[in-house]
Amino acid sequence: MKKVLVSVLSFAFIAATAGSALAAGNKAEGAKVYKQQCAACHGDTGKGDGPSAKTLKPAPTNLTDAKLMSSLSDADIAKVIKEGGAKVGKSPLMPALGATWSKQQMDDMVAHMRDLCKC
């Protein structure tokens, strides 16, 4: 009976872990999309210092700010990307990308942003 219980619990753990690993974003893929669609404002390294940033008021968010980024859940970050800044009380200059990005692209971008802030 003990062996059966250990086997069942082991299987449940592996299944749960595998499912979350498959759902996680790919930070390398996120970095590719970031470079194409985000770096002009947020900068190559995420500091909010992209070539367009000088003319933007408010300035783009510094995505390397670990204190700020740690205070946001992955869902919070995805919501800003999906709905745009104006809808969530952030900069109205941040576009809503939910209509053009897949769930996987959102997950990939969140993974890349977590890599930028090391949080």
Predicted regions mapped to residue ranges:
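Periplasmic/extracellular electron-transfer cofactor-ligation site
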Residues: 25-27, 31-58, 83-92, 116-119
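Bacterial N-terminal signal peptides
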Residues: 8-16
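Sec/Tat signal peptide C-region and signal peptidase I cleavage site
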Residues: 17-23
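Axial heme c-ligation environment in periplasmic c-type cytochrome domains
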Residues: 54-62, 76, 80-107, 113-116
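A short gly/proline-enriched turn/hairpin at secondary-structure junctions
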Residues: 51, 64-65
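Positively charged n-region of N-terminal signal peptides that target proteins for export
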Residues: 1-4
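Alpha-helical hairpin
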Residues: 69-72, 101
